[in-house]
Amino acid sequence: MQNLQKNTPLANNHISVDCVVIGFDGEQLKVLLVKRAGEDNGEVYHDMKLPGSLIYMDEALDEAAQRVLYELTGLKNVNLMQFKAFGSKNRTSNPKDVRWLERAMQSKVERIVTIAYLSMVKIDRTLDKNLDDHQACWVALKDVKTLAFDHNLIIKEAMTYIRQFVEFNPSMLFELLPRKFTAAQLRLSLIHI
């Protein structure tokens, strides 16, 4: 097949994984975020992002997602499933995000294609205990502010995916609920989704 745009360079993509972990604390849905700190043009900033990172050359996507989630949050053996790829050329259009990533990865970064993973969990003391030694925390979905990169879009797409999935497979809701739950908790989880 002939390249119709002969003068257009091929993309030099990096591949990353981003994990959307949605939890229910018995009252509301929350998303697991990690804190990000940096300096940009002399200003120190603190914001948040999804647990995510570039993948290593020798690892599979699923392995990378588990590794990244563990390294950034302390959570392991979480049931993650791929739900969408994000490859917009504008994913790295914010210079602050690019500079932060290049400092963190110690590498020049141009375009990033991310494979988004999704998990639904019940928030309990055991799960929270794993987060204690990491810069990770639960944030109510309604309270999520502007995140790094396109992570707000990824969360929005994850919630759309969950709504569609639950419509055909309501048993997915049981991942959010404690072993013993009330009808009110079930109803609340449905309302928030």
PLM segments and residue spans:
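A eukaryotic nuclear recognition-module signature that targets compact all-alpha binding cores
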Residues: 45-51, 160-172, 183
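Short, His- and charge-rich active-site/binding loops that engage polyanionic ligands
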Residues: 31, 35-40, 45-47, 80, ...
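N-terminal strand-loop-strand
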Residues: 7-48
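Conserved small/polar residues in nucleotide/adenosyl-binding loops
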Residues: 191-193
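Short Pro/Gly-enriched beta-strand edge/turn motifs at strand-loop
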Residues: 1-4, 99
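Active-site segment of metal-dependent pyrophosphate-handling enzymes
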Residues: 15-17, 63-66, 70-125, 165-173
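Active-site-proximal cofactor/substrate-binding loop regions of enzyme domains
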Residues: 50-53, 61, 65
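NUDIX/MutT-family hydrolases
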Residues: 112-123, 127-164, 176-188
